[in-house]
């Protein structure tokens, strides 16, 4: 079926029906008996029934209120409810939350900034200043770069790999909520024991805001409003904050801002004011976080070795580290982007043919730079061109800073158990949706 330009709808070729976006969910909580109708529908979607059930009175579906997180996590949706719920996450609601809180914090991903910078033809540095200026003008106290939280995740990644027995490998990155949701619902027993327990940068940023900044400001976590602007909608699955935004939602606000306000001179130059100063933290290894590259760097720093990288296809990369004395391969890591490649990885793991030690897994082809919440373009050629520009801008971002260690030490003084907030756990999800729908 060719791309017709429709968005947020279900469209069937060669059929007169057209389903417009609506908030109705296909999963009812309660039902009541109604009279059976005799007309013959043009398109019929039904669960398989026994003969005894054929004439049983049907029941109405009661209106249900569900959260966006629940909607995105549900694998039974064949309506456009998910799209509409995403659209309901408006900045009007976000600004209302900011006004009603004692302290508001916004976390923004560098992928979002670079995507929007390409669209608006601005430098990431100037755009970061504009975004921070807009939110600070509307009452946000801190506008944070999610890359700062990613540094906490990176600092724990290699240690976690060392603690993972070779029989339990490969260790799979946990930064992509789309992949984690897929693992929990489809291959729980196989994948969940192998997924990294380190929280994603967005989740760690939430822990920093609610667990560190709140304590530092003398506030309860519930008094703090925390919103995130991320490269994909699936981030809502792991976001326990108050709101979620994406690149396209920021665009009009940034256009309205025009000129960024200067940062007050007395404000300290640190991780809480970096975006206001146009400082965005980059990372070696691409726009999906550079987890695989960080593992390789830490391994080589401790053990030495010869690093060799090969591109298997545009969404799969393999890196090996060879011993400088024996030439033996002592470490294997990979990057696997896109569900087609993810499914190939799962098949290899099922047959125990996957010998990799660590895999950076992302559900989207192209990784986070091509996330569903990034700026979208009409044609495939335009998308690929813009994606290359986003990746180029991301690669040019400055690397690292010295702020993480000082925050870690102060956080430890405020909460001796702070490290527990940097880890999570997963479990298989049992679905209640019938899998026997007949078209």
Swiss-Prot record:
Key words of the record: 4Fe-4S, Iron, Iron-sulfur, Metal-binding
Region Disordered, residue ranges: 38-60
Keyword Cell membrane: no
Species assigned in the record: Caenorhabditis briggsae
Binding site for [4Fe-4S] cluster 2: 176, 232, 364, 368
GO CC, any one term: cytosolic [4Fe-4S] assembly targeting complex
MF terms in GO: 4 iron, 4 sulfur cluster binding; metal ion binding
Biased composition, class Basic and acidic residues, residue ranges: 50-60
A Pfam family annotated for this UniProt entry: Fe_hyd_lg_C
Residues the record lists as binding [4Fe-4S] cluster 1: 25, 71, 74, 77
Lineage: Eukaryota, Metazoa, Ecdysozoa, Nematoda, Chromadorea
The protein's name: Probable cytosolic Fe-S cluster assembly factor oxy-4
Any one Gene Ontology BP term: iron-sulfur cluster assembly
Entry keyword Iron: yes
Record function comment: Component of the cytosolic iron-sulfur (Fe/S) protein assembly machinery. Required for maturation of extramitochondrial Fe/S proteins.
């Amino acid at each position: 079926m060719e791309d017709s330009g429709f968005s947020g709808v279900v469209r069937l070729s060669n059929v007169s029906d057209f389903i417009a976006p609506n908030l109705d969910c296909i999963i009812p909580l309660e039902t009541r008996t109604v009279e059976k109708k005799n007309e013959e529908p043009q398109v019929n979607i039904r669960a398989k029934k026994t003969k005894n059930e054929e004439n049983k009175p049907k029941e109405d579906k009661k209106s249900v209120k569900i959260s966006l997180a629940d909607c995105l996590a549900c694998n039974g949706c064949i309506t456009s409810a998910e799209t509409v719920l995403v659209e309901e996450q408006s900045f009007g609601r976000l600004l209302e939350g900011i006004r009603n809180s004692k302290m508001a914090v916004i976390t923004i991903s560098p992928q979002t900034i670079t995507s929007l910078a390409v669209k608006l033809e601005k430098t990431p540095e100037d755009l970061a200043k504009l975004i921070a200026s807009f939110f600070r003008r509307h009452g946000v106290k801190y506008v944070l770069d999610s890359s700062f939280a990613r540094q906490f995740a990176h600092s724990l990644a290699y240690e976690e790999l060392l603690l993972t027995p070779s029989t339990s490998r490969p260790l799979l990155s946990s930064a992509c909520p789309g992949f984690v949701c897929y693992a929990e619902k489809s291959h729980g027993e196989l994948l969940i024991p192998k997924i990294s327990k380190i929280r994603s940068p967005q989740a760690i940023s939430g822990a920093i805001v609610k667990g560190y900044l709140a304590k530092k400001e003398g506030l309860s976590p519930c008094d703090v409003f925390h919103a995130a602007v991320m490269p994909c909608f699936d981030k809502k699955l792991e976001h326990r904050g108050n709101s979620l935004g994406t690149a396209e939602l920021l665009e009009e606000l940034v256009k309205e801002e025009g000129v960024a306000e200067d940062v007050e001179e007395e404000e300290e130059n640190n991780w809480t004011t970096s975006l206001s100063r146009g400082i965005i933290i980059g990372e070696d290894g691409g726009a999906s976080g550079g987890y695989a590259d960080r593992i390789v760097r830490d391994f080589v720093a401790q053990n030495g070795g010869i690093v060799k990288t090969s591109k298997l296809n545009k969404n799969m990369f393999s890196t090996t580290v060879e011993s400088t004395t024996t030439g033996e391969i002592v470490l294997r890591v990979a990057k696997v982007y896109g569900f087609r490649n993810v499914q190939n990885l799962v098949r290899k793991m099922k047959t125990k043919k996957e010998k990799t030690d660590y895999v950076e897994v992302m559900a989207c082809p192209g990784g986070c730079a091509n996330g569903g919440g990034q700026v979208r373009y009409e044609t495939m050629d335009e998308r690929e061109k813009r994606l290359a520009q986003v990746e180029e801008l991301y690669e040019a971002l400055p690397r690292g800073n010295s702020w993480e260690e000082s925050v870690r030490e102060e956080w430890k003084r405020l909460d001796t158990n702070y490290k527990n907030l940097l880890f999570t756990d997963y479990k298989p999800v049992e679905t209640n949706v019938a899998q026997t729908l007949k078209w």
